[in-house]
């Protein structure tokens, strides 16, 4: 069922680029992200003794919770980082990839015309996620803290929720009609099928559970085993083309 796919990954079928900037600093660190909660998360990790790589991974996880209109575990991303110790520049490619069953004409009808919305909404629009693998790779190869320490702030943020802002309302409105088509998604990101009021709290318990699983068992638990099979089954049952070998 589609709700398995959506509620575990919390992959929302819309994407926008973030334009807001939230910065904070103390005498030692400066952090700027697209959301104030993610900025605080980065500072928290640095104050715990983590390095910039740890902070980048934790911020990514936090944005997956508090910025669902632009980030998420079901998507992809990349990181350009600098290691001062040896003056090394590091680029991490965690972009999503197309399922192996993808075809160049899969978004066209028999007459060669584009099928409206097929490449944007629903399981056929979903690439194979790279964010989780990217976070795990950064922490393992460049970080100083453990994965569970990196993900703990995002886990708590998903459990307790974040406050609806005018920005949230504006960006959700762009895809409100699409969200309504998926009951589990609308139950989380809308209130009674309407855009939430400013000050409402968005809680994502299933996302918290997914992050907890990753924190405990690593990224392999996301891409292999029962969880991965659930994702693939859900996508296929709703017309998508994922296979377990894609993950």
Give each language-model segment a name.
Residues 1-10:
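Bacterial N-terminal signal peptides that target proteins for export
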Residues 24-40, 44, 52-217, 222-224, ...:
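Noncatalytic scaffold domains of N-terminal-nucleophile
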Residues 18-20:
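N-terminal signal peptide c-region/cleavage motif recognized by signal peptidases
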